[in-house]
Amino acid sequence: MCIRDSKDTVTANINITGKGEETAVGVQKIIEGYKKKKETRPLCLRFIGNITDPANTPKGDLMIDTVVAGITVEGIGTDTVFNGFGLVMKNSSNVEVRNIGFMNCNSSEGDDCGLQQNNNHVWVHNCDFFYGDAGSDADQVKGDGALDTKTSTYVTHSYNHFWDNGKCNLQG
């Protein structure tokens, strides 16, 4: 029998405070445990199949914020999709995102995958970006954006596919 943890029940023992390991529950809480920069081990998050909104997402997105230990967000197989939420990075470095489809993003940021500010050494590759929920502006009928990068350096976007997007790749 194969038992897999879900995005909301997966656990990891990580050094959150510098006083030893604590158990974090859920994908977002595990990522948040890296924010205080006490944990130095790299983290690989692997997803399989259709992933709907995790229970704890800031503003409707999976958020990588102030992480420097190195995180890989990886889809396993040919059908991994983040359905109904996006992935946002802020103030982070050494992040890899690969082999994930993004669709129906309905978060407050509005981007399937957004590098919002002060990121460096980020690689987004072999991903599929589909349209999101309509935004408030006339040019946002199919969502705000698919893959947006703002005030970030040493970023590579490679071998990605954009499907029926109104806006697809902002660099600013």
Describe each region flagged by the PLM.
Residues 69-79, 93-104, 119-134, 145-146, ...:
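Right-handed parallel beta-helix
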Residues 20-41, 53-72, 80-98, 104-120, ...:
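Extracellular beta-strand-rich solenoid/capping regions of secreted or surface-exposed proteins
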Residues 43-45, 152:
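Generic beta-sheet signal
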Residues 1-6:
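Conserved small/polar residues in nucleotide/adenosyl-binding loops
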Residues 7-11, 20:
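Short polar catalytic/cofactor-binding loops
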